[in-house]
Amino acid sequence: GKTQRVIVPFALVDTGLRWHVRAYDRKHGDFRDFVISRIEAPKLLDEAPQAHELAENDIQWTRIVELSLVPHPRLARPEIVRMDYGMSGDSLQLRSRAAVAGYMLQRWGVDCSPDHRLTDEPYRLWLADPLTLYGVESAALAPGYQPPQA
């Protein structure tokens, strides 16, 4: 349903499917993503953000994760994927903000399961070390990702 919120936006994010705004949500007291097309009748408030609402305090935004993507192990011709993605060796090294890593992995169709179990055609890449997503809140969006068992 509809809710009213006061947010403190600081970044626009293109997920490849839609635009989001990254903002501090005063209602919940944390940083979140908001789909721009779902925001109705926005109003600009004449207020300065409080210190804890600034982007530098968003751990998921300031954290950079190093992702190592490799051709999916099920592929008979991994060299084609290496060529398609311009891999200089056996992997493609990417850096992403933790806040958007899940969106990126979803958009790129990266199998993030620990045992590369997603075998459908769209999954041409596999995340070589799914533990790199530990503590990344957006990892829930990454195809096949499973949080480590305690």
Positions of PLM-derived features:
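Core beta-strand-centered patch of the WYL/Sm-like small regulatory domain
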Residues: 1-88, 148-150
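Polybasic (Lys/Arg-rich)
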Residues: 60-150
